[in-house]
Amino acid sequence: MAQALGEDLVQPPELQDDSSSLGSDSELSGPGPYRQADRYGFIGGSSAEPGPGHPPADLIRQREMKWVEMTSHWEKTMSRRYKKVKMQCRKGIPSALRARCWPLLCGAHVCQKNSPGTYQELAEAPGDPQWMETIGRDLHRQFPLHEMFVSPQGHGQQGLLQVLKAYTLYRPEQGYCQAQGPVAAVLLMHLPPEEAFWCLVQICEVYLPGYYGPHMEAVRLDAEVFMALLRRLLPHVHKHLQQVGVGPLLYLPEWFLCLFARSLPFPTVLRVWDAFLSEGARVLFRVGLTLVRLALGTAEQRGACPGLLETLGALRAIPPAQLQEEAFMSQVHSVVLSERDLQREIKAQLAQLPDSAPGPPPRPQVRLAGAQAIFEAQQLAGVRRGAKPEVPRIVVQPPEEPRPPRRKPQTRGKTFHGLLTRARGPPIEGPPRPQRGSTSFLDTRF
C-alpha cells in the first residue's frame, strides 16, 4: 500500500506556489530574476517579499525575544507554562528560531543526547541496496526548486539520502516510505542532518506511529475517524462524498502522510508544522476538516462537483488566496475538536475495525498528544533511567557473647529492714539523749 499511495503524492498545478516544480535544470539557468530565491529558499518563488498577512518586523522581534526566553529555561517553561508555548506556536514560530524550537518541541534533543554517535554510525554504514535504489529515485522529486535540492550532488540531496538511509537502518522492520521524503526535506531546510534525523524519528514513532510502516494501519484507522468527524461536523459534505463515492483514502493519505507539505503554500506549511509539533495529530484533523469545508462547504460548490473526479479536483484545487497563512490558520484553530473528542472517536472506530483487516492492528495508545505529553514521558523516563537500582546486601552479624546467668540476691536469714539499711549505708547516729537527774520511778515507789 505504501508504494500505491506514494505514486499519488504529486502536488496539483493549482497549489504549486513556491514549492512547485519547474521540470528541468535548464529552466534554472534562465534569466537572472528567474533564478532569484525567495526568503524560504525557493527559486522563482512568490514569497520574496512579506505578504499582506505577514506580521511586522517589530512584532516578529518581540516574538523572537519570547521564544529565546522560553527556550533558555525549557524544562521550567514546559513544566509550568505550556499554555504559553501552545499559544506562541499557534501564532507561528519565528523563522530564525525554528531550528532551535522544533527539536525541543518534539523531544529530538533528548533522543540525540541519549544516543550519542548513533546517527554517525548509521550514516557511515552501507544501506540496504533495495532501499537505497528506491530512495535514490525519489531524491529529485523533493522540492526540486529549492536551492538546497537543485543539484543531485548538492548538500541537500546528499543529506536527504543520508537521513532516509539512516532511518531504514534504524528501523529495518519499517524501511522506507515515499512520504518520508518531503517530511525529511522540510526538516533539512531548517536543521542539520543529525537533528533532522531525530526529528524524523519522533514524527514517525511518537506523533504518527503506524503511518510509515509497510501496512499503514494507523492511516486506515485515522481515515475512518476523519469520516466520522465529517459526519458530525460537516454532515452535508459527508453526504456528498458518500454519494459520489469519494472515500477518505483517495485524498487523506497525501495530506496526513506528508504533513501537508505537498498540499499547501510553504508559509502555511510551516505554520501547520508549528502547531502540529505542539499539539500533535489533532492539528492534522483540524487542517483536513478546514480544507474540505473550503472546497465543498457551500451548496454551490457541491453542485459543481457531480462526480468523483470533479470532487477530487475541488479538494486539490482550493484557491491559494484562501490558503494564506494567517487567515487559514485562524480557521484551523476555530475547529471545535478537543483531544478528548478525538480519542473517543478513535476508540469507537477501533472497535468497528474488522478482524480480517490486513496487517497488524493499529495501536493508537502509543501516540502521544503533542509536546507536553512527550516532555512528560521523557521526564519520567529520565527519572527511571537516573535512579540507581538498590543492590541487595547480605549482612552477617557476629555471634553474641554468652551472658553470665543472673544471680539471685542472698536474702535468706535477713530481714527486709536489714536489706534497706545495707542498701542505704550505716545508720546515722543522732545527738545523745540527756541524762535525767531525778530518781527513777521504782526508787520512789518502793
From Swiss-Prot:
The record marks 178 as: Glutamine finger. It comes from Homo sapiens (Human). Residues 18-33 have a biased composition (Low complexity). The record marks 137 as: Arginine finger. GO terms for biological process: B cell activation; calcineurin-NFAT signaling cascade; ERK1 and ERK2 cascade; negative regulation of B cell activation; negative regulation of calcineurin-NFAT signaling cascade; negative regulation of ERK1 and ERK2 cascade; retrograde transport, endosome to Golgi. Inhibits the Ras signaling pathway through its intrinsic Ras GTPase-activating protein (GAP) activity. Acts as a negative feedback inhibitor of the calcineurin signaling pathway that also mediates crosstalk between calcineurin and Ras. GO terms for cellular component: cytosol; ficolin-1-rich granule membrane; filopodium membrane; membrane; plasma membrane. It holds the Pfam family RabGAP-TBC. This is Carabin. Residues 405-415 have a biased composition (Basic residues). It comes from the Eukaryota. Residues 436-446 have a biased composition (Polar residues). Residues 406-446 are annotated as: Interaction with calcineurin. SUPFAM superfamilies: Ypt/Rab-GAP domain of gyp1p (SSF47923). Interacts with both calcineurin and HRAS. GO terms for molecular function: GTPase activator activity. Keywords: GTPase activation. The arginine and glutamine fingers are critical for the GTPase-activating mechanism, they pull out Rab's 'switch 2' glutamine and insert in Rab's active site. Residues 92-280 form the Rab-GAP TBC domain.
